[in-house]
Amino acid sequence: MGQVFLLMPVLLVSCFLSQGAAIENQRLFNIAVSRVQHLHLLAQKMFNDFDGTLLPDERRQLNKIFLLDFCNSDSIVSPVDKHETQKSSVLKLLHISFRLIESWEYPSQTLIISNSLLVGNANQISEKLSDLKVGINLLIMGSQDGLLSLDDNDSQQLPRYGNYYQNPGGDGNVRRNYELLACFKKDMHKVETYLTVAKCRKSLEANCTL
């Protein structure tokens, strides 16, 4: 009986520590989701502002080209639909989110420099991407979702954005900016979805459907 009473304080401390870790984890998820929501809204605004400067025929042509083209980050294997997203583990969603954010660290700077419409958003983009990457890394390290078996895709360096690091001038520059903005918006939407699902899973909510 005495041993039981001795164990009770230990169990209580362990319980409080576990609750504290869960609260901190949820706090980090809240911050990460808030940051990526801001980035997604910013990406939408940037794309809409740029799209508004185009002529109707120019807009239609660029949209057709983009639908046939692909984003640099498409080489990162990620869920193809809502069903696959919901089947993915928390840790897998965090790893994919980390890779997607990482893939935009340099291209976003190039885009800002090349387009005068985006200069005012420069600090917001670079700071938010950097903060979000650090936050997701903390969530990965603190995740108790099990070990993730990373395939070769996760260790590969992303291909460069073709000629996007150069300044083609004229129509080439317009197409490059359109594609980068469209891809940035697309990827921020992906990360927002993945982090929202992961956060819901960690909060033990009954319904995490998209």
UniProtKB/Swiss-Prot annotation:
Main localization category: secreted
Pfam name, any one: Hormone_1
InterPro entries: 4_helix_cytokine-like_core (IPR009079), Somatotropin (IPR034975), Somatotropin/Prolactin (IPR001400), Somatotropin_CS (IPR018116)
The keyword Mitochondrion is assigned to this record: no
Compartments it resides in: Secreted
Domain of life: Eukaryota
Annotated CDD domains: somatotropin_like
Residues at which Zn(2+) binds: H38, E192
UniProtKB keywords: Disulfide bond, Hormone, Metal-binding, Secreted, Signal, Zinc
Leader sequence segment: 1-22
GO annotations of cellular component type: extracellular space
UniProt-listed GO biological process terms: animal organ development; calcium ion homeostasis; growth hormone receptor signaling pathway; hyperosmotic salinity response; magnesium ion homeostasis; positive regulation of growth; positive regulation of phagocytosis; positive regulation of receptor signaling pathway via JAK-STAT
PROSITE patterns: SOMATOTROPIN_1, SOMATOTROPIN_2
GO function terms (MF aspect): growth hormone activity; growth hormone receptor binding; metal ion binding
Disulfide topology: C71-C183, C200-C208
Name by which UniProt lists this protein: Somatotropin
Native source organism of the sequence: Oncorhynchus kisutch (Coho salmon)
Taxonomy of the source species: Eukaryota, Metazoa, Chordata, Craniata, Vertebrata
